Amino acid sequence: MSHNHDHNHDHEVISLVDEQGNETLFEILLTIDGREEFGKNYVLLVPAGAEEDADGEIEIQAYSFTENEDGTEGDLQPIPEDSDAEWDMIEEVFNSFIDEN
């Protein structure tokens, strides 16, 4: 299984708006090209400025996304919890990313 990923974002920041209209800034940790296997890309996000907790962990959110035709912005969608194949691929790429850093 081969998936391209990019982690040279120099801490690109995006904002997400929740159901209550609250805007939260996130840093892009990693993008994954899953188009060949799943027909979409993925992005892993961490809250902007977040630090590890007492256990050395940090909250990471994963979304699938589709870029606009001009390569800018796009739609983020939650990844279905029951999509084991997608989650397995994301976990594999993330673990490789951690091992490289």
Swiss-Prot record:
The record lists its disulfide bonds as none
Per the similarity annotation, which family is this?
Belongs to the UPF0473 family.
List the InterPro entries hit by this protein, alphabetically: UPF0473
PANTHER family on file: UPF0473 PROTEIN CBO2561/CLC_2432, UPF0473 PROTEIN CBO2561_CLC_2432
Tell me the protein's name. UPF0473 protein str1961
- Signal peptide, first to last residue: none
One Pfam family, short name please?
DUF1292
